[in-house]
Swiss-Prot record:
Residues 1-39, 51-140 are annotated as: Disordered. It is linked to IgA nephropathy 3: A form of IgA nephropathy, a common primary glomerulonephritis characterized by glomerular sclerosis, interstitial fibrosis, and mesangial glomerular deposits of immunoglobulin A and immunoglobulin G visible on renal biopsies. IgA nephropathy is associated with renal insufficiency that can progress to end-stage renal disease. Proteinuria and hematuria are characteristic clinical presentations. Belongs to the sprouty family. InterPro entries: Sprouty (IPR007875), Sprouty_domain (IPR051192). The Cys-rich domain is responsible for the localization of the protein to the membrane ruffles. Pfam families: Sprouty. It comes from Homo sapiens (Human). Antagonist of fibroblast growth factor (FGF) pathways via inhibition of FGF-mediated phosphorylation of ERK1/2. Thereby acts as an antagonist of FGF-induced retinal lens fiber differentiation, may inhibit limb bud outgrowth and may negatively modulate respiratory organogenesis. Inhibits TGFB-induced epithelial-to-mesenchymal transition in retinal lens epithelial cells. Inhibits CBL/C-CBL-mediated EGFR ubiquitination. Keywords: Cell membrane, Cell projection, Cytoplasm, Cytoskeleton, Developmental protein, Disease variant, Membrane, Microtubule. Residues 177-291 form the SPR domain. The lineage of its organism: Eukaryota, Metazoa, Chordata, Craniata, Vertebrata. Its main location: cytoplasm. This is Protein sprouty homolog 2. One of its GO terms (molecular function) is ubiquitin-protein transferase inhibitor activity.
Length: 315
């Protein structure tokens, strides 16, 4: 019985050895240390590392030749050295004394990563600033050349072959003159010049002297009434209600006399129409360049042919 008890007591350490794995009871579990190492950095820690940004979007200022930029501290190389150190696995017995140092290991890795990114951005900003300095330097150095910039398109000299004489149609357009006044008798010159007019309200209403008189003397109401009362589409009595040469002259004048009792402004239509004719004649006399004679003889004036000039440079 004692032998069995001893053998039973002696088998307990054999069963405990694989469970302990050569680790003492006071030592921490290495898996806990690994879980402590792998953790995510917070935003406060990242901001504490990089509180300023070296890259700027604003324009760079050209440094003066007498001043030299101050050298920057070489903190990036220190972080790169920390990043370049080989990682060795430590025995589990020494991990409980370096828990705090292992917790800072990801922090150093992030520092090296940020430093490498900032180094690339610093190179980019340095290259861009150097290119801008070259451009600015070239613009400053080319100051006297700016006075010789050509701002007007140069004109080439005319060659004799490029000078074309006027055609016969252009010469004979104003060749027919009046025998009495000596002015041109072509269609363009003898056409009567009307008073100026213009479209208003997005080209919906024509503003002219005739329309002003029609709306001012209420003749537009008479024209509308005659338009709706006429049966013939070809009847133009609505356009000229006071005409004596068209049909239904007595009927129209009687209707206008009755309407003038309710619209007294109709009495001003005939005087306003006479003033319009007078203004039209004065405007035509001033602006018409052609002949205004009714019965006159036409004389054809020949335009003398002028030989072309020689634009060659004298030798």
């Amino acid at each position: 019985m004692e032998a069995r008890a001893q053998s039973g007591n002696g088998s307990q350490p054999l069963l405990q050895t694989p469970r302990d794995g050569g680790r003492q009871r006071g030592e921490p579990d290495p898996r806990d240390a690994l879980t402590q190492q792998v953790h995510v950095l917070s935003l406060d820690q990242i901001r504490a590392i990089r509180n300023t940004n070296e890259y700027t979007e604003g324009p760079t200022v050209v440094p003066r030749p007498g001043l030299k930029p101050a050298p920057r501290p070489s903190t990036q190389h220190k972080h790169e050295r920390l990043h370049g150190l080989p990682e060795h696995r430590q025995p589990p017995r020494l991990q409980h004394s370096q828990v705090h140092s292992s917790a800072r290991a990801p922090l150093s890795r992030s520092i090296s990563t940020v430093s490498s990114g900032s180094r690339s951005s610093t190179r980019t900003s340095t290259s861009s600033s150097s290119s801008e300095q070259r451009l600015l330097g070239s613009s400053f150095s080319s100051g006297p050349v700016a006075d010789g910039i050509i701002r007007v398109q140069p004109k080439s000299e005319l060659k004799p072959g490029e000078l074309k004489p006027l055609s016969k149609e252009d010469l004979g357009l104003h060749a027919y003159r009046c025998e009495d006044c000596g002015k041109c008798k072509c269609k363009e010159c003898t056409y009567p010049r009307p008073l100026p007019s213009d479209w208003i309200c997005d080209k919906q209403c024509l503003c002219s002297a005739q329309n002003v008189i029609d709306y001012g003397t209420c003749v537009c109401c008479v024209k509308g009434l005659f338009y709706h009362c006429s049966n013939d589409d070809e009847d133009n009595c609505a356009d000229n209600p006071c005409s004596c040469s068209q049909s239904h002259c007595c009927t129209r004048w009687s209707a206008m006399g009755v309407m003038s009792l309710f619209l007294p402004c109709l009495w001003c239509y005939l005087p306003a129409k006479g003033c319009l004719k007078l203004c039209q004649g004065c405007y035509d006399r001033v602006n018409r360049p052609g002949c205004r004679c009714k019965n006159s003889n036409t004389v054809c004036c020949k335009v003398p042919t002028v030989p072309p000039r020689n634009f060659e440079k004298p030798t």
